[in-house]
Design a protein with these regions (language model features):
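Multi-pass, polyprenyl lipid-linked donor-dependent membrane glycosyltransferases
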Residues: 110, 130, 134-169, 183-194
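Short hydrophobic/aromatic helix or loop-helix immediately within or flanking a transmembrane segment
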Residues: 50-65, 71-95, 274
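Short, Lys/Arg-rich, polar N-terminal cytosolic tail immediately upstream
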Residues: 1-10, 212-219
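Transmembrane-helix signature of polytopic, membrane-embedded enzymes
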Residues: 97-101, 118-142
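Transmembrane-helix motifs of polytopic, lipid-linked glycan transferases
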Residues: 88, 105-126
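Membrane-interface transmembrane helices that cradle and orient dolichyl/undecaprenyl
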Residues: 126, 130, 165-176, 206
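Membrane-lumen/periplasm interface segments of specific transmembrane helices
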Residues: 23-35, 39, 184, 195-298
Length: 298
C-alpha cells in the first residue's frame, strides 16, 4: 500500500479519477434537473446518446449499411475503429450489456487514458507547476460539449490517440507515434494530418530548427538511410487507407465516407473561417452557434 502511495503514476491516476468521478456525478445530477425543467422522464442513457450516437450504436449492433439499402444517409461516413472496439467489448461480455453502456464504457476509459498521458506529457515537456497541470483533466471532463467524450461518439478515442501520438513523439518513439496516428486516422479522417507533425518533429530531431535547402536535402538522405523512420511515417494514414479499401470492396467506392455526406448537408464552407462565421451569425443549427462563440472565447 505504501508503495502505491509513493508511486507517482498511481497518485496522478487517483487525482484524475477523482476529477472524473465529480464530473460524472454532475452529469447524473443534471438528468433530473433537465427532466424537471422540460417536463420529461428521459433516462441518463437517452440524454447522453443523442444524434450520431444512435448511428454508432446501429453499426455496433448490425454493421455498416448495405449498398442496396434505401436509406440515403448510409452510415459509411463513420470510421470503424471505435465501432470495432465497442463490438469487441460487447462480444466479450456476451451481448448482455446494453450497446449504449458498452460505448460509454469505451469512451470514458479512452478519455481517462487521454487525461493521464496529457498530464504526464505536460510535466515532462514543460515547466508548468504540478497543480496547474491538473487543469487538463478538468477541461477534458468538464468543459462545454465534453459530454461527447462520455457518449457513444468517437471524440474520446480520437483525443486519446492524439495525446498518445504526441506523448510518444516527444519521447522519440517514432514507430509508436506512427501507430497512434494510424489508429487516429481509423477513428476520424483528420487523423491523417498527424503525419505532418511526425515529419516536422523528425526534421527537428535530425537537423535542428533552421530550414534551408541543404538541410532539407540532408534530411531526405538521412531518412532514406533509416527505414524504421520511413516506416513510422508511412504507417500514419494506414487506418484511413484500410477503411477506404474496405469501402471499395463493400460498396465499390473508396471515397464513400466522403461522398455520402451530401445526404446530411449540401452547403460548403471555407475551412475554419467560413464555419465560424456561419456558426456565430446563426446561419446553421443553434448548437453550432454556441460552439462557435465558445471557440472564439477561448
Amino acid at each position: 500500500m505504501n508503495r502505491l502511495k509513493n508511486n507517482e503514476n498511481c497518485r496522478l491516476l487517483l487525482k484524475i479519477l477523482i476529477i472524473f468521478a465529480i464530473s460524472r456525478l454532475i452529469m447524473l445530477i443534471m438528468v433530473p434537473v433537465y427532466n424537471g425543467i422540460m417536463g420529461t422522464h428521459r433516462s441518463f442513457l437517452f440524454l447522453m446518446n443523442e444524434w450520431d450516437a444512435k448511428k454508432y450504436a446501429y453499426i455496433i449492433n448490425h454493421g455498416y449499411t448495405h449498398p442496396t439499402d434505401i436509406d440515403p444517409q448510409a452510415n459509411w461516413a463513420f470510421f470503424p475503429l471505435y465501432v470495432i472496439m465497442c463490438a469487441a467489448l460487447k462480444a466479450v461480455t456476451g451481448g448482455l450489456i446494453n450497446t449504449y453502456v458498452i460505448g460509454m464504457i469505451v469512451s470514458n476509459i479512452c478519455i481517462i487514458i487521454a487525461a493521464f498521458f496529457a498530464v504526464k506529457g505536460l510535466k515532462k515537456q514543460t515547466s508548468i507547476k504540478e497543480e496547474y497541470t491538473m487543469i487538463m483533466p478538468v477541461l477534458l471532463f468538464m468543459a462545454p460539449y465534453t459530454f461527447y467524450c462520455s457518449s457513444v461518439y468517437t471524440e474520446a478515442m480520437f483525443i486519446m490517440f492524439i495525446v498518445l501520438f504526441f506523448y510518444f513523439l516527444f519521447e522519440k518513439k517514432y514507430m509508436a507515434a506512427g501507430i497512434m496516428a494510424a489508429c487516429s486516422s481509423g477513428t476520424r479522417i483528420v487523423g491523417c494530418i498527424l503525419v505532418f507533425a511526425l515529419v516536422v518533429q523528425l526534421y527537428i530531431d535530425m537537423e535542428g530548427t533552421k530550414i534551408s535547402f541543404g538541410k532539407v536535402k540532408t534530411f531526405v538522405m538521412d531518412m532514406l538511410k533509416a527505414p524504421k523512420k520511413i516506416l513510422s511515417v508511412l504507417v500514419c494514414p494506414l487506418g484511413a487507407f484500410a477503411y477506404m479499401a474496405f469501402l471499395n470492396f463493400f460498396c465499390g467506392d473508396a471515397w464513400a465516407y466522403k461522398n455520402v455526406q451530401i445526404a446530411w448537408r449540401e452547403d460548403e464552407y471555407f475551412p475554419i473561417i467560413g464555419v465560424l462565421w456561419k456558426a456565430c451569425t446563426g446561419q446553421i443549427e443553434p448548437r453550432y452557434t454556441y460552439m462557435g462563440w465558445f471557440c472564439i472565447a477561448i
